[in-house]
Curated annotation (Swiss-Prot):
Cellular compartments annotated: Mitochondrion intermembrane space
Annotated signal sequence range: none
MF terms in GO: electron transfer activity; heme binding; metal ion binding
Binding residue positions for heme c: C19, C22, H23, M85
UniProt function note: Electron carrier protein. The oxidized form of the cytochrome c heme group can accept an electron from the heme group of the cytochrome c1 subunit of cytochrome reductase. Cytochrome c then transfers this electron to the cytochrome oxidase complex, the final protein carrier in the mitochondrial electron-transport chain.
Protein origin, superkingdom: Eukaryota
PROSITE patterns reported for this sequence: CYTC
Modifications made to the protein after synthesis: Binds 1 heme c group covalently per subunit.
Name this polypeptide is given: Cytochrome c
Amino acid sequence: MGVPAGDVEKGKKLFVQRCAQCHTVEAGGKHKIGPNLHGFFGRKTGQAPGFSYSDANKAKGITWNEDTLFEYLENPKKYIPGTKMVFAGLKKANERADLIAYLKQATK
């Protein structure tokens, strides 16, 4: 399938509006309600040091990349049943692509 190309600036706005209340992205950023996302591309689910994940998240065992994140962000509770993340998801493919484009840049 492949993830469509996203717009970093639109993704940043989405992050601020929909994600920043629970997540940080900068190196050394604090965990909030959700984990700091720095360096999460290429990491397995439930692996950010110092964050208390649900058993479901730890057990999922997938590696975060564009494709897995694209599917997850559409409906987190469907992708990882039992996740603590209360976010309902982004139904529009272009919004998910924009957010992923931003996260790829912001979490390096």
